[in-house]
From Swiss-Prot:
Residues 175-524 are annotated as: Interaction with Dif. Keywords: Activator, Nucleus, Repeat, Transcription, Transcription regulation, WD repeat. WD repeats lie at residues 86-125, 296-342, 615-666. This is Mediator of RNA polymerase II transcription subunit 16. InterPro entries: MED16_bridge, Mediator_Med16, Mediator_Med16_C, Mediator_Med16_N, WD40/YVTN_repeat-like_dom_sf, WD40_repeat_dom_sf. Gene3D superfamilies: YVTN repeat-like/Quinoprotein amine dehydrogenase. One of its GO terms (molecular function) is transcription coregulator activity. The keyword Lyase does not apply. Component of the Mediator complex. Interacts with Dif. Belongs to the Mediator complex subunit 16 family. It comes from Drosophila melanogaster. It comes from the Eukaryota. GO terms for biological process: positive regulation of DNA-templated transcription; regulation of transcription by RNA polymerase II; regulation of transcription initiation by RNA polymerase II; response to heat; response to lipopolysaccharide.
Amino acid sequence: MTILYKVEGKEFSKDSVFPHKKVLCSVSARNIVAFSALQSAIFPASHGGDAGDGSLPGAGLAVGASNSHVYVCDIVTPWEYYKVCSSKSLISVLQWSPNGEQLLLGYVGGRVEIWQPRNQSINLWVLQYYATVPSEDIIEAQFFQNGKGVIFNALKKDHTYYAEKFERVEQQRPTLSGFGGVASEGCVLLTSSGLLAAFSLPAIQKTSAAGADGPAHEVVELTPALHSIGISRSFIEHCSMTPSPSGALNIAFSCGWQQQLVQCFKVSLSLEGELGLEQHLAIKSESQTSIFLGPLDGRRISHLKWTRIANEDVIFIAYACPDGAGSQLEQWTLTRRHQSVHALLQGGGGANNKPNEFVQSESWEQVGKVQLNASLADISVTRLSVSTPDSCQVYAILQDNSVQVLEPNSMKQLNHTQFDRLSDASGAVKFVSGDLTPSSQILLIFDSHAQLYAMQAPLPKQGGSGLLLLEYCIVTGCDASDVLLLNLGNLEALVEKLTDNFTRQPSFVRHFYYANFLALKSNICRMQQQEFDNLIILHAISTTFKSLLRPSDLGFQDKGPADNLAIKLAESIPDVDTVMLNLDAKDFTVEPVMLQSLQQLIQWVTDLALNMLHRLPEEVMKTKLSGKRPSYDISRDIVAISSLRELLVMIRIWGLLNTQCLPVYTKTMDNIDVLVILFRLLTRLAQNPAEPDEMLLDECSLLSKQLLIPQPTKFNPTTLLSAQGFAAVKSGQLQFTSMEEPTCLQDMETEEVVFASSVKDGVSNLQLGARPSHIRRCARCGFVFVNNASKVAKTSALKAWFSKWLHCHCGGFWKQVH
């Protein structure tokens, strides 16, 4: 296994007021790591909980009280973390929602909180819901499942269509179904006394996409439904909870006074009450086949882990051996058998009833065990829904700062990695917890000082290729940053194959996954220092502009205005006015006030076309000299060229309705018509984008002499997904210091351009000045978005445009910058 990086946390104090230094961690589907530090901490004053102002690090430090602190960080910027909240109570549960946008915190004392980032800003968190189970200690929690699962089958990597590669989990149901079978959102809790609590999240209370300076946020108090998990209550020491395909939750726990028994229960939820009236949540708990252990000989259970491997229920039981003699890990699998029934006990007897010759029985069987040389800190199992056990691995995180990778069933050791060796000092740093990323490619580990370690997980026997993992992320919507951080080899060939496979999908499949595909491809191109974000913005502007078009006569239109425009442009007419005369102008009529509000977007479209044509001769020359082409170049993308031609025709028509919406340029001669020139050159480029003719290149070279070409805005944040970060990860193990941006990953490229010191809003295409007061910047790609977008938008078209940017196009979170 390869150690990717380590983040030293100098902010955390070496002396803790708690008897045990305990760090909980959890990784979301968006590759955001949440961890809790149950000790005194020194943190940046700008990253303070729900009252934080979101400033950049380095604005000052503040000493935190001896409380429980919760932080989050991105795996591509692990040195920079943000505070979620602090509490005087000890945190016992840390759990992400399935979509990675809500964080559940369970405390000793019975309080449960659900936090979420405000306006998708990773450094500004707000309390959304809370509930209380008085005089109880929360020891386990699980969000409701939506019943949508995808099987990862490495044997189908050669299939063409996504529907064949990634099958849906059959007969999987949500934890709680509402009206019409729609999955409900909520949580199930288990306390240390065996009390179950469940509550659903009201959908109407979700945070709107208002600006950061919008109305005050309202915290919703929820009343949970309570039910005892068993007939009697008892003190639970260790437990594990996992969803089952039937929609129920499987729970296994061990009690302190009954160490040789691991009890198993199935918990199901339902809504009781008449439809249309007030319904309440009902909890049903059923006892299942339990595990009866043999003589423990002084051992005590230290960990329980219930999971599903290849459609089988599996429980891992870890024991702490006496006198510090290491630990032991066992795997128990639930087997189902058909037992024959004696003829006298068989049912039936009627004319239509057949006797029951067999009855199904369940039992737990121990299939493997392994002796570990050190105490076990945590267990992690492959998070992918695999089809075969060969695609799954078990990770035993040991307190001697080592990790053992085990094979399921046989429990044979596949790999062993030793991190920093443990010293003999009593205050030595030890591994305490860990978790896998969504695609199970990176194992993240925290030690007792809340320092983060990242290691590349070894590929299993049927691990699949990097291409298959990336396509899996496209289909499931999971973040693919952990896959991109691996040593994928030839990125250009990977992008070409990924694009080729995507274009082979049916049109409705491409349309459904297009946003996920663009976000993934933009991250890959950013690692190759290639510009792909322009295509995403161009696609968003194109859909926004086309949504404004309405046919003049609904009764005699079998195609919309956008379809008719595409048909006319297929004839490759070089004159934009000729194309405009062949169209019905009434179909493109838009209110002049609305067109005025879209002027900055219109300016962006023509700026992109102008820059693309201006750089075309230089790009062609680079290709001839180097002998190889980049994996992506927008000037060779026929889809982008066609979208630009369509938008130029629409802009030409709208300019007749309102001249104030037309783009503005500084020209050397007054008789230059920019739209006519751009459309003519783009039409000629569309005929052969792979090899433009010499005459076209000559005309493109003259553009800089005819008008002033605006310089494109570049966003170059310091992340591991940049070209510098990708090269550093491939070179070997990296070491970072928390809250210190590594200089080795910074982009040192500087250009003397107009507005070089000015910040530009990438969404509105507006210059915000050198020091804007409130902006949002993407934590991954550096894209800038104004905070008060809802106040700027005066028309419905502009409001629809801003609503597209609730999330950044690259899949990252926003970061509030003051």
